[in-house]
């Protein structure tokens, strides 16, 4: 069990940032995974009063505040229209509605959890993170970094024309995923993202041109096999490395078929 000595609702990002410079303090987000750990927090920093709990849609992008709940993301009409329903599909099996009403997008992204559906999904989009001190950084770059004392303010998803698909395999519906797989085709570039390896999600691009020159079943098989071959897998209680490699091929191919059927030829 985690113990908290002091609770502060930050009045500004500057106040939250300054408090967070002490290693004994912590930004709490939705407080769902943090409370399952052990240890002591001197000051728990809550960002709930800073107006970061919504999704703003502009002509160029979606601006998703760090305190936006997964449930709000799941139900957001604009985001789901843009991603052909992939946004909702990426989070709908995360525990339950009550959990998704509390869990935050920022907490999920900052945690860079190896089991994260959220990280897998957003890596398949043209996504950037806005950090209070670090500025705007591509999510793919941010996902590979270590943890520091900065504050994640929001996600920025550029509206790059494309088609999208998301699938995950779970041993039971509300369990943590055995493997996650997002796939996108934006302006001719295919991007497959594999997570729950078990490890942070990895982006795979069609660097060998396996999908160029027209989409066929043979090309889908070749690219799916390529993704399964290049992504490092591991074993845990939910599945073996060999099983995850098999799932990567199957889920990638099914996402490719979905993209083709939705007009991504």
Role assignments for model-derived ranges:
Residues 1-265:
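C-terminal structural segment of proteins
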């Amino acid at each position: 069990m985690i113990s908290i000595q002091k609770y502060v609702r930050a009045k500004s990002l500057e106040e939250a940032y300054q408090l967070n410079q002490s290693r004994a303090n912590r930004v709490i987000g939705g407080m769902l995974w943090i409370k399952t750990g052990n240890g002591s927090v001197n000051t728990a920093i809550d960002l709930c009063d800073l107006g970061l709990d919504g999704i703003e849609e502009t002509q160029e992008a979606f601006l998703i505040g760090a305190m936006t709940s997964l449930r709000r993301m799941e139900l957001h009409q604009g985001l789901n229209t843009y991603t052909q329903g992939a946004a909702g599909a990426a989070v709908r099996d995360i525990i339950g509605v009550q959990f998704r009403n509390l869990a935050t997008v920022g907490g999920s992204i900052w945690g860079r959890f190896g089991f994260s559906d959220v990280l897998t999904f957003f890596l398949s989009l043209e996504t950037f993170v806005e950090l209070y001190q670090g500025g705007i950084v591509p999510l793919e770059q941010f996902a590979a970094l270590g943890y520091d004392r900065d504050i994640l303010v929001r996600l920025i998803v550029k509206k790059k024309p494309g088609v999208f698909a998301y699938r995950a395999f779970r041993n039971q519906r509300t369990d943590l995923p055995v493997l996650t797989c997002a796939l996108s085709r934006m302006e001719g570039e295919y991007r497959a993202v594999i997570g729950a390896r078990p490890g942070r999600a990895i982006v795979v691009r069609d660097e060998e041109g396996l999908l160029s020159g027209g989409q066929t079943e043979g090309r889908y098989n070749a690219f799916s096999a390529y993704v399964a071959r290049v992504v490092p897998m591991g074993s845990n209680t939910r599945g073996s490395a060999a099983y995850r490699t098999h799932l990567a091929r199957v889920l990638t191919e099914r996402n490719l078929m979905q993209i083709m059927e939705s007009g991504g030829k």
